[in-house]
Amino acid sequence: MLKLLIPTIMLFPMIWTLNPKWLWSATTTHSLIIASLSLTLFKCYSTTQWSNLNYMLATDMISTPLIILTCWLLPLMIIASQNHMSTEPINRQRSYITLLVSLQALLIMAFSATEIILFYIMFESTLIPTLIIITRWGNQTERLNAGIYFLFYTLAGSLPLLVALLYLYNTAGSLSFISMNLISIPPNTWTNTFLWVACVTAFLVKMPLYGVHLWLPKAHVEAPVAGSMILAAILLKLGGYGMIRMTIMLEPATKSLAYPFIILALWGIIMTGSICMRQSDMKSLIAYSSVSHMGLVASGILIQTTWGFTGAIILMIAHGLTSSALFCLANTAYERTHSRTLLLARGMQIILPLMATWWFIMSLANMALPPLPNLMGELMILVSMFNWSNWTILLTGTGTLITASYSLYLYMSSQRGPTPNNLTFMELSHTREHLLLTLHIIPIILLMIKPELIWGWCW
């Protein structure tokens, strides 16, 4: 893992010593090299055991795709932020890139930690750079309110997890992911019920599950483009990754305690999808769409089947790339219209036809059109849900229909219709923006051609 961590850490002195003229191009190039280097983790991919194992860090079939996604996203965030950060003083630009790089370093350590307490520390540490990015570089004064929601929801969910980890250490004598899988917890005792809820709550808030999701739309709407990208693509998946790890460890208790959470997750798919149909704010619609998709991921994980886990991992990776691209597209519209309102951005297809093509492709990816990896993930979760209970097809089927509806609503509202007069003298699209979206779709195409890279246990 040091082959990724050391180059990432070496970015810090580079950022603060570079000539301002080369700041953005050099950091983008360096981060792209790290992203290319991360692809070598697939070579160490082992279907039966941990790879790159040392005392503190290791990778396996769950963490490898998420680490690579984290490394791939840093250059994309830097490219996306160039335009709106160019007017800032040079030291603020350096601070901004430093926060993005520190997030990557923390996330790599979180995804590759073998000790649960190290994972917990890194899980909480990602909160600090994200909070600074939202509250310092957000667009409006509501960013402070969004930051408070983000901070207190996450902290309130994480405190019970810390208590549960201390209890686990006292009873089991170890907090290693590798050894904890061998220790079974006896079911049907009040202590273990509270232990299971405490361990899972932090990750359900982070995903987020419907009911504890109110921080996410606020944080997404107020964050700058890089904040929205990292939040949608990686930080929500940190909750899913933690759930996969913890529910396997708490296995006997999961089967009996997961039922209400599965039903809440499925109900949340329909509710948040319905909320999307009523949104007038572009970023808010994409944010609620993320809550809907994460509800499907949560239900797939809580089912505790091989297909459920694999579908959840595939959907997390595919959704990370798709939602990040949608936030980039929303940012391109915002930079030209200075508004996130869908009605003020309509008719842009006539002025920016290539950008409208990107909107169309990403809207189709969001609604899980074949043969995209989004469909693979959703199908595997739907099949495992149907095998668990035939009645779930009513909720998941309705949720899929609503997802298709709001994805098309997003495209039609933002691209079709008469062009408002204020958009007549709009700035044309840049090569930088098309490069950014191309770098989003290349991994999606790769996963269409070779899906076994992220199929985990099912391959």
Swiss-Prot record:
What family is this protein classified in? Belongs to the complex I subunit 4 family.
Query: Which major enzyme category is it?
Result: translocase
> Which reaction equations make up its catalytic activity?
a ubiquinone + NADH + 5 H(+)(in) = a ubiquinol + NAD(+) + 4 H(+)(out)
Q: Does the keyword Transmembrane apply?
A: yes
GO BP annotations of the record are: ATP synthesis coupled electron transport; electron transport coupled proton transport
The parts of the chain that form a coiled coil are: none
- List locations, semicolon-separated: Mitochondrion membrane
**What EC numbers are recorded for this enzyme?**
7.1.1.2
Protein name per the record:
NADH-ubiquinone oxidoreductase chain 4
What are the record keywords, sorted? Electron transport, Membrane, Mitochondrion, NAD, Respiratory chain, Translocase, Transmembrane, Transmembrane helix, Transport, Ubiquinone
Main subcellular location: mitochondrion
Q: What does this chain do?
A: Core subunit of the mitochondrial membrane respiratory chain NADH dehydrogenase (Complex I) that is believed to belong to the minimal assembly required for catalysis. Complex I functions in the transfer of electrons from NADH to the respiratory chain. The immediate electron acceptor for the enzyme is believed to be ubiquinone.
Lipid bilayer topology: Multi-pass membrane protein
Q: Name one GO cellular component term.
A: mitochondrial membrane
Listed PANTHER family: NADH-UBIQUINONE OXIDOREDUCTASE CHAIN 4
Membrane-crossing residues?
Answer: 20-42, 61-81, 103-123, 148-168, 194-214, 224-244, 257-277, 284-303, 307-329, 350-370, 392-414, 435-455
Q: Which GO terms describe its molecular function?
A: NADH dehydrogenase (ubiquinone) activity; ubiquinone binding
